[in-house]
Amino acid sequence: MTDNELLRLIKMVNQIAENFDNGGAEDEVATQVLDHVNRFWAPSMKFKVARYAESDGSMLSPPSRLAVLLIDQSKKA
């Protein structure tokens, strides 16, 4: 994936978080984002954005970053 693809993924996950944010707790929004990403994103998309969150993550909103960091953990559960 190119940097443009990563930027698109960051934008998408932030939009998903914004759509789920109804004033609830950050971890609740992150759980909904995680569920959406696990259901609808290809493994390569999840891998790319998860590696970004681990290495930097500064362009991710707080609930997006939390959700993305939980991707690997949710597979083990």
Across the structure, where does each feature detected by a protein language model lie?
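A domain-level signal for the structural core that forms small-molecule/cofactor-binding pockets
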Residues: 1-77
